[in-house]
Amino acid sequence: MAWVMHEHADVDTLAASVATELQAFCGEAIALRGQALLALGGGRTPLPLYRRLARCPLPWSQVTLLPTDERCVPHDDPACNLREIGAAFAAADGVELQGLTPPNGDPETSERHARAALAQYPQPFDAVVLGMGMDGHTASLFPGVPRLPEALDPASDIDACRIDPQPLPPEAPYPRVTLTAARLLRARSLHLYLSGADKRAVLERALRSHDPLRYPIGAFLHAADARLHVHWSP
């Protein structure tokens, strides 16, 4: 089995439990290597987790956070994942944030910028936190986009690529840059963070499908060489 399910009583328990796990992973990484590296999904669902983790006692100046994906918007735009993550970690004094796009969010240079940024961090992530949309996408790995097979290839040596959702989501109509599945799977711990019955139903369909082009989260649920910890609450 490439995945393991952790069910939590409610969203507060979910956030507290996963924050405790991530704190432990960070502490272990810092003790062993002097640095912890995390890739974090955007959106509203994980923000309580991030705020709780930010209050944990860690040497935050030795922790680096990257988004798993980013919208090609300026860094001060409310739609910017880096901006939201930074706000959620306001209590984590000294934490380092690494963006995937240039400050102006230029779509034409964002892929190159992301690959150069990731080249500074060749080591595996100490933890990755993924979310999942109602269409089964994770990060910005959307079903049906032309570059999806390339972005999901587990043998790829490409760390990031530009994704243009088709059609663009009306709530966030922007080109994206996303970490590839191969880069996200290069992690010491891999977590999917979900809540609600609707998301549980999508998860069950993805588990049955075994087709990551239809449900991109399946590339992580069924990965041969990684174990995905699925954290869910009602």
Residue ranges with predicted function:
Residues 1-38:
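N-terminal glycine-/serine-/threonine-rich phosphate-binding loop
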Residues 2, 61-129:
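Ligand-binding beta-strand-loop-alpha-helix segment within the catalytic cores
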Residues 34-41, 126-128:
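Short glycine-rich phosphate-binding loop at a beta-alpha junction
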Residues 40-45, 130-134, 195:
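Glycine-rich beta-strand-to-loop/alpha-helix junction loops that act as flexible
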Residues 52-60, 83-87, 143-152:
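A glycine- and small-aliphatic-rich helix-loop capping segment at beta-alpha/alpha-beta transitions
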Residues 56-64, 91, 151-153, 182-187, ...:
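Short, conserved loop/helix-junction motifs that constitute active-site signature segments
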Residues 134-182:
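Class I SAM-dependent methyltransferase SAM-binding "motif I" and its flanking Rossmann-like core
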Residues 180-182, 186-234:
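ATP/nucleoside-binding phosphotransfer catalytic cores, i.e., glycine-rich phosphate-binding loops
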